[in-house]
């Protein structure tokens, strides 16, 4: 449940860097995603054609503030996105480091506070830091989106312990792993940890077969979520035979 919206798909898909508009639409359909992210900058460059294209997908739009480095830039972009796309949903990105694309936690919390006060439903791109998460919730956010690894790196879940801790600490808060996912197995792993959804883009857009990869991610995320619900067996330090030793043949 994200801001009162119940989604059947746990995959959120980005819309940048695809080989063609047709491939993008086919990938969205193959993935089963119900939420797609969109950049206001791309919408402006396309002159409205991109928005018309996305309307064909019938997905819910999640505009983002990609490329923003200050509170002012992020807030202004969010306000414009609400007018252009007609939604209060906003994926809030305030980048603090150009090389790693790591979010600036101080600017992020301040921008979230401003936008939540203005009625936005904020999806903040953050790290797995628990204190930052607490501050974002205090600012009014009802969803947290910690990164798995730097955007576009494909490194997967670099800090498993931190993500586990975040899931345990924020038991009743929807959590979405956002950024750094490069393979379906990594997305499944995030869901097995108990996360509520995964947001990704580059892993599908830059695949040899984006449509096939989108389908693979959709299935992997569903499998990971079902595995978590079913209950994963606990890890052991030592072996534990699954076959009983009683009834073994006695050899002379």
Curated annotation (Swiss-Prot):
GO CC term, one of those recorded: cytoplasm
SUPFAM superfamilies to which the protein is assigned, alphabetical: ThiG-like
KW DNA-binding (keyword) present: no
Chain sites annotated for binding 1-deoxy-D-xylulose 5-phosphate: 152, 179-180, 201-202
Catalytically driven reaction(s): [ThiS sulfur-carrier protein]-C-terminal-Gly-aminoethanethioate + 2-iminoacetate + 1-deoxy-D-xylulose 5-phosphate = [ThiS sulfur-carrier protein]-C-terminal Gly-Gly + 2-[(2R,5Z)-2-carboxy-4-methylthiazol-5(2H)-ylidene]ethyl phosphate + 2 H2O + H(+)
Coiled coil start-end: none
Pathway in which the depicted protein is active: Cofactor biosynthesis; thiamine diphosphate biosynthesis
GO molecular function: thiazole synthase activity
Keywords of this entry: Cytoplasm, Schiff base, Thiamine biosynthesis, Transferase
Location relative to the cell: Cytoplasm
UniProt enzyme class: transferase
Keyword presence, Transferase: yes
Similarity comment: family membership: Belongs to the ThiG family.
Protein name: Thiazole synthase
Species annotation: Gluconobacter oxydans (strain 621H)
